[in-house]
Amino acid sequence: MIEKIRAMKNKKGFTLVELIVVLVILAILAALLVPALTGYIDKAKNQAIISETRMTVMAAQTLVDEAYGKKDVGATVTIGTDAAKDDVTKQAIADLAEVPVANIGDITFDTKNTTKIATLEYTKSGKTCKYTANPTGSTEKYVVGAASSK
């Protein structure tokens, strides 16, 4: 009997209290890291929509420039969804930018330079990114916000 007690004392291992303390420490660390990781995920999503908006703006500007080069001097270029009446379609822009056509919103031209894209809206996953060529009061050309319901 005494030998069994001595054998139990020689066993190495963690007590239940030590294991609970480790679990509590891990829970505290997880609680501190979750908000920080959520912030990084939101920033990454914003950067992704800005990147896709930038690709869409470049694709639209490229197609508008090509269409303008084929027209007479002083003629205007139109963007729309009807290939028969519009010079550039949103589908062509989406194909060139490799984005879904449903994500492309309103596109407007500069009033002084009718071949320059002035604004473009791009919506994805509940967020809208608005490109403004010449922002006033702000130096940001790409602004991400919650999607507006129209």
Task: Give names to the regions the model predicted.
Residues 1-14:
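N-terminal leader/signal peptides at the extreme start of proteins
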Residues 11, 29-32, 44-47, 51:
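Residue-level signal for short amphipathic helical patches enriched in basic/charged
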Residues 12-38:
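N-terminal single-pass transmembrane signal-anchor helix
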Residues 37-57:
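Aliphatic-rich helix starts adjacent to a transmembrane/signal segment
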Residues 58-80:
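Alpha-helix exit/C-cap motif
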Residues 72-132, 143, 148-150:
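Extracellular/periplasmic head regions of type IV pilus-like filament subunits
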